[in-house]
Every structure is written in C-alpha cells, then in structure tokens.
Amino acid sequence: LDLLIKLWIKDIFPKNKSIKLYSTPSELINNDYNIFARNFEDKKTMVKDLLKSKVLLVPGHKGELYCIAAEEARELCIPIITLGIGSLSERVEHGITGFVAKNYDEFAYYTLEIFKDINLWKSLRNNLIKLRGSKKWDIVAVNLLNQI
C-alpha cells in the first residue's frame, strides 16, 4: 500500500487532481492528495462502495498466492491496474480486464488513461461483463495446486 500511495502522490495525482483514491488504513488518508477512507461498515455497504469505483489500483505483493481482491473486482466488472507482483499477473489479462504495468511509469500512465479515455474504460468493463461468472472455483483450485 505504501508503494501505491507513493505513486499516487508523485506520479498520478499531480497530472489529474480531479480523481480520488479510496484506501485503508486510515493513517494513510491525506485529503491534500485526494486520498480518502474507504467505507467498510458491512458487506452490503462495501460492495455498493466498490461498485462506484472506476478502477482497482493494486500493485501487488510478493507474498500473494491468489489475490482475492482482484477476483472480487473482476466479478464486479472493475478494471484492474497492477504491477503484476505476486499473483496479480495471473489475475489480470493485459488489455482485456485491465493492465499489467512493467514499471511505475506505466502504472501511472494506465491509471491516468482509464480516467481520461472513457472508451478505453468501457472496453475493459464490457470485457469484464462478458467474463463475469466464467471462473469456477474447482478450476481455480486445480490451477493453484498445479503450481505446488
């Protein structure tokens, strides 16, 4: 999360000050850079809040084996931008369900493009709508176990 906040403050927010980043935990909130607390009252409220999101920004973590947050975003038809760290390169189909950036500059670029180009966002979202429900847990489990 520290990496995302750093990229947001340095490379994303200065180029588009109208966009907002919703995050947790609260000690990282910084209204000067449009970083706000995400609402986690209950599951229903959380899903409604997530559905308002235009994109999920998740660089990834080397300790992630699956990243359920990416699958939740996929099923909610929210495009994902990632650096592909950990399992994220397996969760995101580059140019179809989001973008796997090769570096920090690309991460910032793809983030800004999704907010700038409504047709790009619609294309990714339409792809996600078509793919909704296509991942079955028995297949996901087999794929995970095959990596062991």
Regions found by a protein language model. Give the residues of each.
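Conserved catalytic-core segment of nucleotide-activated headgroup transferases in glycan assembly
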Residues: 1-36
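Conserved active-site histidine-acidic residue motif and adjacent donor-binding/catalytic loop
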Residues: 33-50, 61-63
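Short alpha-helical segment that forms part of, or immediately flanks, the ligand-binding pocket
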Residues: 47, 70-75, 89-90
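Acidic donor-binding loop of glycosyltransferase active sites
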Residues: 51-65, 78
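Short glycine-rich donor-binding/catalytic loop of glycosyltransferases
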Residues: 61, 78, 82-89, 103-104
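Short glycine/acidic-rich beta->alpha loop that forms part of the nucleotide-sugar donor binding site
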Residues: 64-67, 74, 84-85
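Conserved acidic donor-binding segment of nucleotide-sugar-dependent glycosyltransferases
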Residues: 94-105, 113-118
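A charged, aromatic-enriched C-terminal amphipathic alpha-helix characteristic of glycosyltransferases
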Residues: 102, 119-148
